[in-house]
Amino acid sequence: MGIFDWKHWIVILIVVVLVFGTKRLKNLGSDVGEAIKGFRKAVNTEEDDKKEQPAAQPAQPLNQPHTIDAQAQKVEEPARKD
């Protein structure tokens, strides 16, 4: 048993019904259902659009890689001011 037993959930459900009323909870449930349906439809439509589009050609790099010749120089450390 965790923090909430089944009896606790019954009491919480009764309090929620008393506070919001059954009509408002019914409307809330239908609104949530419509939102989930719309989300699923949008996801499926997006996946279908991706399937219909042909694979894009890989783009050529704008700048070809090149090597820069450089030479390291030794730098003297500044004198400490202790």
From Swiss-Prot:
HAMAP family: TatA_E (MF_00236). It is a single-pass membrane protein. One of its GO terms (cellular component) is TAT protein transport complex. Keywords: Cell inner membrane, Cell membrane, Membrane, Protein transport, Translocation, Transmembrane, Transmembrane helix, Transport. It comes from Pseudomonas paraeruginosa (strain DSM 24068 / PA7). It is found in: Cell inner membrane. Belongs to the TatA/E family. Residues 43-82 are annotated as: Disordered. InterPro entries: TatA/B/E, TatA/E. The Tat system comprises two distinct complexes: a TatABC complex, containing multiple copies of TatA, TatB and TatC subunits, and a separate TatA complex, containing only TatA subunits. Substrates initially bind to the TatABC complex, which probably triggers association of the separate TatA complex to form the active translocon. It comes from the Bacteria. GO terms for biological process: protein transport by the Tat complex. The chain crosses the membrane at residues 1-21. Part of the twin-arginine translocation (Tat) system that transports large folded proteins containing a characteristic twin-arginine motif in their signal peptide across membranes. TatA could form the protein-conducting channel of the Tat system. Its main location: membrane. Pfam families: TatA_B_E. This is Sec-independent protein translocase protein TatA. One of its GO terms (molecular function) is protein transmembrane transporter activity.
